């Protein structure tokens, strides 16, 4: 085996372990592989072996690109238990080098290798997270390659899902929700495969961290605007949480484009799943996020934000965090959506007919933007809102009166819409002859609503506990015994109750 190994590798080093531990660059892939494998034999460092391996990888990252022909032999001999970070770095070197040379065969092989190791669960997810500047750009680039170059989005989706799942298990753990550049590509692949349910668990409405995808040595060189952008995003990405409830991790390093990709593509997935409230939350953040210049995602998000707002609220409000000048710019760039944004639902004004007319006149623009189905849904929803407004006015009503007051075309249309409202559990209905007896139902809270409420309660309990701890540890008037003894004079010692002693 040693002979075979030496034939595959060149420039072997007999002092690989010593070189690695001293921080020296290792001159060959064989030396690097030996240095990493020897980490597992050093029992005293078993707990931080992943960090040591990550340090070796960063010190020798250029070696993987220079020796890309030796990558497969390296993968065969490197132990994934200690060398997961090195193995993905090797695959990234092979992928990047092949892509730069337009070597499609080499690029395909790199994707095949990554798919194999991820699919077999060979990598240690905890070790992969230690090299975010390697694993996440690799997943992102592989996903885009499968999506755009090979027209195989299902492969890119499977690879990213498996890799992210190993690093951030979705098993109810209390691990922080982390945003990476790979998430947006994952959602883009799912929009092509139409496998929305599989990626739904990866769409977090409460993001705790942004992955630092800049190399640690390059952090000082990163653009301050990118870090400011990340801080603003984290400050807003807390759906259902009390204002300022969570501390934000400072100085995240991720290009704003990938954050916008996450927001926009994630919102598109949620729209397909009919989770309109959550989609609106992501779209509102995307529209309101600052950027160096107006990105395509900003304008596309504004268009969908207008339509989803009308579906949910019957009107379009200016986003709380939005830049009013940017909103005006969006309206100027999309006059059709400007007309939609001026709609205000009113039963007596026959709003659904006005919306239907706008949809017909803007059908070409809607089709180009991919919003035709949302617009059709909007027209139906406006008709349902008209019927819902009647339930608040009358507890019983004739079908013919519903048809007249809701400006609907036929009795069949009335009964069809009422049937849909019953199926959606928005009203209960009892029909007796031509009379309809109905009641509006309160919406059933979704799983996300319940989780958000629990998160708020947990946060309030934490604040209460911290407050009590501060009071007990404080001095003077901060102590509870003094606070309840204010009338006894500042010079008097606090009185302690003996009632229950």
Curated annotation (Swiss-Prot):
Residue ranges occupied by any PCI domain in the UniProt entry: 275-445
Protein name per UniProt: COP9 signalosome complex subunit 3
UniProt subcellular location: Cytoplasm; Nucleus
Main localization of the protein described in the UniProt heading: cytoplasm
GO biological process, one term: oogenesis
Role played: Component of the COP9 signalosome complex (CSN), a complex involved in various cellular and developmental processes. The CSN complex is an essential regulator of the ubiquitin (Ubl) conjugation pathway by mediating the deneddylation of the cullin subunits of the SCF-type E3 ligase complexes, leading to decrease the Ubl ligase activity of SCF. The CSN complex plays an essential role in embryogenesis and oogenesis and is required to regulate microtubule stability in the early embryo. Mediates mei-3/katanin targeting for degradation at the meiosis to mitosis transition via deneddylation of cul-3.
Family: Belongs to the CSN3 family.
Pfam families reported in the protein's UniProt record: COP9_hel_rpt, PCI
Top-level taxon of origin: Eukaryota
PROSITE patterns: PCI
Keywords: Cytoplasm, Developmental protein, Differentiation, Nucleus, Oogenesis, Signalosome
InterPro entries: COP9_N (IPR055089), CSN3 (IPR050756), PCI_dom (IPR000717)
Subunit field text: Component of the CSN complex, probably composed of csn-1, csn-2, csn-3, csn-4, csn-5, csn-6 and csn-7. Within the complex it probably interacts directly with csn-2 and csn-4. May interact with itself.
A GO CC term attached to the entry: COP9 signalosome
């Amino acid at each position: 085996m040693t002979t075979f190994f030496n034939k595959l590798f060149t420039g072997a080093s007999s002092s690989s372990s010593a070189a690695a531990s001293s921080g020296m660059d290792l001159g060959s892939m064989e030396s690097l592989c030996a240095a990493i494998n020897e980490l597992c034999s050093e029992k005293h460092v078993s707990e931080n072996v992943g960090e040591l391996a990550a340090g070796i990888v960063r010190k020798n990252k250029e070696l993987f690109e220079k020796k890309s022909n030796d990558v497969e032999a390296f993968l065969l001999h490197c132990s994934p238990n200690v060398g997961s970070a090195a193995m993905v770095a090797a695959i990234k070197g092979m992928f990047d080098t092949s892509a730069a040379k337009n070597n499609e065969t080499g690029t395909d092989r790199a994707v095949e290798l990554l798919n194999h190791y991820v699919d077999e669960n060979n990598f240690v997810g905890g070790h992969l997270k230690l090299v975010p500047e390697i694993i996440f750009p690799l997943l992102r680039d592989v996903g885009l390659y499968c999506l755009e170059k090979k027209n195989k989005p299902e492969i890119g989706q499977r690879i990213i899902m498996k890799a992210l799942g190993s690093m951030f298990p979705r098993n109810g753990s209390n691990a922080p929700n982390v945003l990476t550049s790979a998430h947006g590509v994952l959602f883009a692949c799912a929009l092509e495969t139409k496998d929305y349910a599989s990626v739904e668990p990866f769409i977090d409405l409460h993001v705790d961290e942004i992955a630092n995808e800049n190399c640690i040595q390059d952090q000082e060189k990163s653009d301050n605007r990118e870090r400011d952008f990340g801080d603003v995003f984290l400050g807003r990405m807390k759906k259902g949480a009390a204002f300022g409830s969570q501390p934000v991790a400072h100085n995240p390093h991720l290009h704003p484009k990938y954050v916008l990709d996450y927001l926009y593509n994630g919102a598109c997935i949620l729209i397909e799943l009919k989770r309109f409230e959550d989609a609106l939350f992501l779209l509102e953040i995307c529209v309101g996020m600052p950027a160096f210049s107006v990105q395509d995602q900003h304008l596309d998000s504004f268009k969908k934000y207008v339509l989803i707002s009308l579906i949910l609220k019957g009107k379009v409000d200016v986003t709380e965090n939005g830049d009013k000048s940017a909103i005006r710019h969006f309206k100027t760039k999309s006059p059709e959506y400007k007309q939609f944004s001026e709609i205000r639902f009113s039963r007596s004004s026959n709003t659904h007919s006005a919306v239907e007319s706008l949809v017909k006149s803007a059908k070409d623009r809607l089709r180009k933007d991919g919003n035709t189905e949302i617009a059709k849904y909007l027209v139906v929803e406006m008709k349902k809102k008209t019927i819902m407004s009647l339930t608040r006015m009358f507890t019983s009503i004739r079908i013919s009166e519903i048809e007249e007051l809701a400006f609907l075309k036929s009795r069949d249309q009335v009964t069809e819409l009422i049937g849909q409202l019953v199926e959606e559990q928005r009203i209960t209905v009892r029909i007796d002859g031509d009379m309809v007896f109905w009641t509006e139902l309160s919406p059933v809270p979704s799983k996300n609503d319940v989780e958000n409420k629990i998160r708020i309660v947990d946060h309030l309990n934490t604040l209460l506990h911290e407050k009590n701890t501060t009071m007990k540890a404080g001095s003077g008037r901060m102590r509870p015994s003094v606070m309840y003894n204010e009338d006894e004079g500042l010079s008097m010692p606090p009185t302690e109750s003996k009632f229950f002693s």
